[in-house]
Amino acid sequence: SKNIAIPLNKGLLLEVLGEEPITAATKRIELRIRGEKDFNPMAELDIESLRFGSYEEVNFGRGCKPLRTRVEGDDLIVTFKGKGSGITPDEWAPKLIGRTKQGEMVFGYASLPYVDYRPAILSARRPWYDKEANAVKVSVENFGLSASKPAEIAVTIDGKPIGTTTIGALAPYARTTATLSQATLEQGTCEVTATVDGQLTVLGKFTL
């Protein structure tokens, strides 16, 4: 048998405005609540009931309180006090909860302008030794939805550097082979890493 779930409350379309990351020191937060074909946020929402911030705050009745509103086309812009948002640097999608003027619950998760929701995701396969080329090779693929930046690929075995090389940008789902010349493999725990803009990421660990 199959269960088909149809949400009765589809959630609001929300977008945080402004490019600066939200911190505990943020004094004001502007939130766009998008109007829809069957939804007029200014006419239907109980503004005073709205609370915005981390789900860990708003789920327990806390969060930021609204200060003022303005209308932009079909959308409603709500300015919240920044205090009490609970939003941390690793916040993915802060939450809004509240009520309509008829007392029905509303909620939604907002996109943040400084969060990349379509990142490049590099992954490496198990390295191998190409005897003819006298080189270690490793296949690197981008599983993300955006093109990756050029990266420095490094291979270590038990923490000992085997070699490094650079690969160019990869389109989504594209693959390339990184070649580490004059390198060999030996038994141990192999780690493949990528460094992009100074940030190191482990692409894979393998037992050789």
Predicted feature descriptions by range:
Residues 2-4, 105-113, 200-208:
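Edge beta-strands of extracellular beta-sandwich domains
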Residues 20-26, 126-133:
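Short, solvent-exposed loop/linker segments at the N-terminal edge
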Residues 52-54, 155-157:
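Conserved aromatic beta-strand anchor motif in extracellular beta-sandwich/beta-rich domains
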Residues 70-81, 172-179:
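Aromatic sugar-binding surface patches on proteins
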Residues 83-90, 183-188:
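Surface-exposed, short loops/turns at beta-strand junctions within beta-sandwich domains
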Residues 140-145:
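Asparagine-centered strand-capping/turn motif at beta-strand->loop junctions
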Residues 160-187:
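Intrinsically disordered, low-complexity Pro/Gly/Ser/Thr-rich segments with frequent PxxP/GP/PP motifs
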Residues 184-208:
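Terminal connector regions
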